């Protein structure tokens, strides 16, 4: 990693850190659950994206994911940080994102923030995952 990612003064991604990434069909977000080198959970990084309509394109090897530049960090303490707003505004100015899509992205972000505050986001299934307990059996490391 070229340089650490810092949110609110705390390193959330760096060399040796890792994440489990979740992509959802027909949703306006994806979620990365981030851990430090020691396996301590740091929080969730959520990209606002155009909804993915097919998760198994190209025989399961690839998917098309369109990042809309607007991101949300949810710390382990449930503190919310909206990220990359400058990139989002610039993308609208350069017409990388239509005004209609930008408006929907902003609405979805606001909805996610409200859901975080009411403890309804991220989805319960994502919150429950404990990687060393839940994922090793799936990888054949029992």
Where does each model-flagged region fall?
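Cysteine/selenocysteine-centered motifs that mediate thiol-based redox chemistry or coordinate metal-sulfur cofactors
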Residues: 108-142
